[in-house]
Amino acid sequence: MLRAGGTPTNTIVAGGDQACDPHERGSGPLYANSLIILDIFPRDPKSGYWGDMTRTVVRGRASDAQRKLWETVKEGQELALREIKAGIDGMKIHKAIQALFKKRGYPTEVRKGKNVGFFHGTGHGLGLEIHEYPRLQKVTLKDRQVLTVEPGLYYPGLGGVRHEDVVVVTKTGCKILSRFPKQLEI
């Protein structure tokens, strides 16, 4: 979308503990060997349609704990991508990801007065609004709906990880529209 003239607005580049707030835009220096969330959501000025994509990287070397967190979120997104199809309940997908994260040792809870873990939605509709119906929660998915799929885990002291891609729901699955690779270390 950027190559076609899309205009990015309010891009998120948040590292370290700033990346533990899913909507924190980020400020200040980005430190080597810390998780950095890059969330870009360009809008096509001609059609008015939005794109949305998130990648999480480490500039330098990832620790074992960072790598495990990153791989677990990737596994959660892959689970969602396998399950999405017309007729499925979005909440079933959301709960399956929650269960996977908990099984891998990443609970969702309140620590020191702050939410940690998987405390935001699995995804949302995308089109003429950046966040529109349907949410990937308690709703039956329909053929040709356009959604983001963006599970994330957030733990201050370790960092945040989110992988986000845009898909079109089909009768038999989903078609991934995002084409940018996922790479942990850059």
Regions found by a protein language model. Give the residues of each.
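Active-site neighborhoods and metal-handling regions in enzymes and metal-associated proteins
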Residues: 1-186
